[in-house]
């Protein structure tokens, strides 16, 4: 939604050198600590070694207590995976987590481990124990740094801002800001010109404004306008493209809202009507049929968990600008 993955990957490409190795892994598909350890070891071995012999040597040197099962494809340098046969309660896990530090020492370099969709670890069984183990090992490493990022803001916030969790204040938190309109205008117009088409500054700006500068939506809407443009983008091209973006996202919005309770839908209706705080006043409770003050808290937590609302500067908002328009049409708000 915000382009964080592409930003991190671009930074990785720029920073990579003989003295700084970058390891990137996406753990979205990991459903257990065992999945994580397999993915972690595979990524570290693969992305810090330039030859098959080298990562096989590193396995022998640094994973001596483990008998990993190695699967190779046609290209062993890019197509291989590791399955670790280990006892989760033994020191073998620490051996895996220490792998990047030991490789960095051997190579005389520093390593940055970039882990995408890091919030997945909150879903693991005995997650808090798992988190404690990661932090206890990682915080003592001297040559390895960690860039941990994810797409579910409320879960990431909880992992790093909840005092009772192991990763509390583990590092500096960076919240990505939206890309500025001026930068988007130059980018959009440049992409049109590269294909012998034109779009005015005003229309490019309108694309940004209509979707509140959300990276994925700006790119999607600009692309839809581009498809409809013959030579010069028109207002009609823009309006048709905007309807397209609503239509294309309607199935997703329907799926996200079909199981909502009446209270939850009423809460969203209140936001659409301009209520962003003080939901527990008698006037708001009665007008939008939200039940009791306690019920409002339950509804709010549920909608935050579903990522349908967010809290920004103590104001409750619907963060998705296209969904906002769709909801208004559906609810007649």
Where are these regions (language model features)?
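Conserved Walker B catalytic segment
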Residues: 82-152, 161
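Conserved AAA+ ATPase "SRH/arginine-finger" region at the nucleotide-binding site
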Residues: 172-183
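Alpha-helical DNA-recognition elements
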Residues: 14, 224, 302-305
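Amphipathic alpha-helical "lid/sensor" segments that cap RecA-like P-loop NTPase cores
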Residues: 185, 189-252, 262, 313
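P-loop NTPase nucleotide-binding core
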Residues: 2, 6-112, 294
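An amphipathic alpha-helix signature
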Residues: 34-41, 181-189
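C-terminal leucine-rich, beta-strand-based interaction scaffolds used for sensing/assembly
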Residues: 247, 251-333
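Short regulatory helix/loop adjacent to the ATP-binding pocket of P-loop NTPases
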Residues: 153-171
């Amino acid at each position: 939604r915000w382009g964080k993955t592409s930003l991190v990957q671009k930074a990785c490409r720029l920073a990579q050198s003989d003295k700084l190795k970058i390891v990137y892994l996406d753990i979205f598909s990991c459903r257990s600590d065992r999945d994580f350890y397999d993915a972690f070891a595979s990524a570290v071995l693969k992305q810090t070694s330039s030859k098959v012999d080298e990562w096989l040597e590193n396995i022998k040197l640094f994973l001596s207590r483990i008998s990993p099962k190695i699967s190779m494809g046609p290209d062993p340098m890019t197509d291989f995976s590791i399955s670790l046969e280990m006892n989760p309660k033994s020191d073998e896990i620490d051996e895996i987590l220490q792998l990047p530090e030991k490789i960095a020492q051997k190579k005389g370099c520093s390593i940055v481990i970039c882990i995408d969709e890091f919030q997945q670890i909150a879903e693991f069984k005995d997650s808090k124990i798992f988190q404690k183990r990661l932090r206890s090992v990682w915080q003592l490493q001297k040559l390895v740094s960690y860039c941990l990022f994810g797409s579910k803001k409320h879960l990431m916030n909880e992992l790093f801002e909840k005092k009772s969790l192991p990763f509390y204040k583990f590092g500096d938190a960076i919240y990505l800001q939206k890309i500025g309109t001026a930068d988007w205008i130059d980018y959009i117009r440049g992409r049109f010109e590269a294909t012998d088409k034109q779009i005015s500054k005003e229309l490019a700006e309108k694309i940004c404004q209509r979707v509140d500068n959300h990276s994925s939506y700006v790119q999607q809407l600009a692309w839809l306008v581009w498809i409809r443009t013959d030579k010069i983008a028109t207002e009609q091209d823009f309006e048709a493209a905007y309807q397209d973006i609503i239509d294309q996202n309607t199935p997703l919005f329907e799926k996200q809202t079909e199981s909502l309770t009446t209270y939850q839908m009423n809460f969203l209706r209140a936001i659409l009507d301009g209520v962003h705080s003080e939901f527990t006043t008698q006037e708001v409770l009665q007008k939008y049929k939200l039940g009791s003050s306690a019920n409002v808290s339950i509804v709010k937590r549920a909608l935050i968990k579903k990522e349908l609302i967010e809290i920004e500067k103590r104001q409750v908002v619907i963060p998705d600008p296209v969904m906002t328009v769709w909801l208004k049409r559906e609810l007649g708000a």
